[in-house]
């Protein structure tokens, strides 16, 4: 039996009387890509944030057996620092050797600006690519992505999916949230969420 790289056991999240996510189980095993699909407010971001450790579940637990990279929807970097400065800083925080060299490789890999502008002044697409680059600095085996290509053009989207598909092919696991039905082709498994619960519906029934 394959040991999951990440396992969520009955995780749920409440905000007061509002149930954002009902108790949910999820395993990510090596070599798979899981798509979380559903309309706005379905619980996709909440589930991913719990898996990433960005928010605490109201109940349940998450077991991680591998390094996790996390790409949230919102900027996960310091707006006053340049792309290079952010990458160097996060590389150091991850304990990456030769942080400057690692930052340089990511700048090139994701075609990020090297002109020293604060990242807060970059385009939405550049900021999102910077999020992905930061998530990959620690060479994670699990990559969690919350609508990572929503602000990207086709070429930029292709670059992100090349990275995610390669990680899966190398025995990692990817879990991503999307409302873009074309991106489901990258998934080996699709989970439909609706009203904070895993739904017994097809993608077509949800988006009709």
Descriptions of predicted regions:
Residues 52:
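Helix-to-loop junction immediately C-terminal to a conserved catalytic motif
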Residues 100, 106-121:
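Conserved ABC nucleotide-binding domain
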């Amino acid at each position: 039996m394959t040991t999951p790289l990440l396992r969520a056991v009955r995780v749920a999240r409440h905000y007061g009387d509002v149930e954002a996510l009902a108790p949910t189980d999820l395993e990510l095993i090596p070599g798979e890509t899981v798509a979380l699909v559903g309309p706005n407010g379905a619980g996709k971001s909440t589930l991913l944030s719990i898996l990433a450790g960005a928010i605490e579940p109201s109940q349940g637990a998450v077991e991680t057996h591998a390094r996790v990279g996390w790409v949230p929807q919102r900027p996960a970097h310091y707006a006053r620092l340049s792309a290079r400065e952010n990458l160097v800083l996060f590389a150091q925080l991850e304990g990456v050797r030769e942080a400057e060299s690692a930052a340089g490789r990511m700048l090139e890999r994701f075609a990020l600006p090297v002109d020293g502008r604060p990242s807060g002044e970059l385009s939405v697409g550049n900021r999102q690519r910077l999020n992905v680059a930061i998530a990959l600095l620690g060479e994670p085996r699990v990559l969690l992505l919350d609508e990572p290509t929503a602000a990207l053009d086709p070429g930029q989207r292709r670059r992100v999916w090349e990275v995610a598909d390669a990680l899966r092919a190398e025995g990692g696991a990817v879990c991503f949230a999307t409302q873009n039905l074309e991106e489901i082709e990258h998934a080996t498994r699709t989970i439909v969420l609706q009203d904070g619960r895993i739904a017994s519906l097809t993608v077509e029934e949800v988006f009709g």
